[in-house]
Amino acid sequence: MSPIPNRDSTWDTVTTVTMLAGAGSQLLMPRIFYSDPEVTVGWKARWHVSVLAPVMTMTALAALNEYSLKGAFQGQRPGCDATNFGLQNCETYGMMSTQSFAGGAALGHGVAVFVVDTLKWSGGRVNGYALAGDVITPFVFGMITAIGRGVGNWETPGEVAVGGLVGLGFGFLSGMAYTLLQRPECGYTGNLICW
């Protein structure tokens, strides 16, 4: 029987917190855009309740992975095999990494929002705050999450990479659909929060 592998519980906590922070950044980040010429010209920031749709989609996909797909893929965690599966630190499978999926999804969503808001809704004008909130913040949290999952011996590099890349793709697609279907402007109400 293979020995029970060591896992770093601190990295498990850190990566869970950074995963939630990355996803939360997309939930709380306003849409920043250069407004239409028909209204007051200049940079605007509007929060949209409709951002719940792509964020909850990514949350549902992460839960599907954690509670269903991992059992179907049966990718063993580092140090686990058929002889010690079910014992301490080998109770669950690692493929694909849910934390890396969520971190990648947050980054993909943020990149899509930034690209569409910059190119379509702002006429190519780049806003530094939008770049920081939509791209840099989820990138930093996603990298800490991905590195921590490997350093803490929770998942293999392949499990982390697959989770992150699949999340990046799904996040980008959902963010693209959201930003193309939902204008950043709240209309003529001037509200900061749009439905």
What spans do the regions from the language model cover?
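A short hydrophobic/aromatic micro-motif that marks alpha-helical segments and, especially, helix-coil
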Residues: V113-F114, S174, Q182
